[in-house]
């Protein structure tokens, strides 16, 4: 068994689409909409990891359209202190072919730029190196 957190799910168990992960396992987060003011609601997380009290969040999109206003606002606010960094990747999740990436850090969103999966991995490794060198509650920069 792999030590990595690999998605193990068979959407076709019981027939085509009968065991769809989104239907069977994702919470219906829209039921909480009435708990928040001003149209605010939960969003899903594509990926998140923590090392030495630093978080790296993966936001995966299938096209280069701008992130939604609420997402950008949240990511900028959560990244202000340097504890959370966001990597925005554009690509095909089925094939893992990446076309673009960008970052949000210290409240600043970069523009998307052409990238490959290897570029994304390199950026993640840069973040890991800095996070591993970090002393608790001292913001990192990359």
Q: What role is predicted for each listed range?
A:
Residues 50, 78-81, 130, 134:
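Alpha-helix C-cap/termination motif
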Residues 47-49, 54-63:
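Conserved catalytic cores of phosphodiester-cleaving nucleases, focusing on short active-site segments
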Residues 14-50:
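N-terminal first-folded block
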Residues 4, 8, 14-29, 91-142:
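Domain-level recognition of nuclease-like catalytic cores that cleave nucleotide substrates
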Residues 34-42, 62-110:
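Catalytic cores of nucleic-acid endonucleases
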Residues 6-9, 31, 72-75:
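Hydrophobic transmembrane signal anchors and adjacent membrane-proximal interface regions, especially
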């Amino acid at each position: 068994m792999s030590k990595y957190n690999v998605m193990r799910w068979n959407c076709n168990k019981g027939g085509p689409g009968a065991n769809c992960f989104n239907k069977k396992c994702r919470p219906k987060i829209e039921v909480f909409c009435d708990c928040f003011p001003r149209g605010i609601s939960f969003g899903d997380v594509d990926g998140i990891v923590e090392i030495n009290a630093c978080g790296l969040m993966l936001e995966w999109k299938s096209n280069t359209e701008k992130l939604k206003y609420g997402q950008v606002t949240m990511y900028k606010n959560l990244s202000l202190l340097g504890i959370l960094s966001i990597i925005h990747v554009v690509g095909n999740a089925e094939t893992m072919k990446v076309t673009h990436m960008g970052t949000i850090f210290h409240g600043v969103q970069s523009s998307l730029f052409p990238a490959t999966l290897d570029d994304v991995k390199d950026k993640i490794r840069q973040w890991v190196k800095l996070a591993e060198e970090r002393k608790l509650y001292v913001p990192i920069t990359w």
